[in-house]
Amino acid sequence: MRLIARAPVDGNYDAAAEIKLMGQAITYWREPGEAGVPPIFSFAGSDNIARADVLYPVPNRLDEAGLEAFAYRGRVVFPIHVVASDKTKPARLVMTLNYAICDRICIPAKANIALLLPQSGESPYRAAIEEALARVPVPLAASDVASKVAIDAESGQAKPQWTVKWHGSAAAVDLFAEAPEGWAFDTHKTVDNTFTLTAAEIPAKETHVDVHLTVAGADKSYEFSAPLTMPAGAQAK
């Protein structure tokens, strides 16, 4: 595991945490699915850093002993957007990362690492960082959601269910759903660019929720928030 970075643009840095995994081992996305734990980043102790925001490349949907995991296999690079407190002075990024490495068994891992961010010059890690940034979903503006996505409630289902149709120019290969604590949603592809979204767990007496959806494409992915109202007569079990 290592930290890499390139010289700043307009005083802001692009760094990244790179994890290389052996064999068939995996590590998890921010929403790990039915198994696993998400990575936890901390930048406490950094010098001349106003903020550091971790970006998450789109994961793969993987089978882990019969459970669905949203994870990465082989290698993953998490971009980190860094804003210096004083852009005229050097910045030192200190990172603690707690994560899991899973193959036949899961092992907790922890990395403590620091990097003096480069202030100028060409970085040998530029291509790796740009490749990772290209795998991060693009936030979809609220004004664009209606034209690119159709979400329709399905009646007569045992559990609350919606059909999600993607109308973007690029094909959608997968859909991931994130929800507040107490909620859980399953997603499955039915036909090209069409998915079912099913509420598997609902807190008692709750009828509305904002779900964060990630539409994964082969070349470009998007993420957006979708307000949902539970269809009448349906109930998660």
Describe these PLM feature segments.
Residues 1-237:
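Extracellular/lumen-exposed scaffold segments
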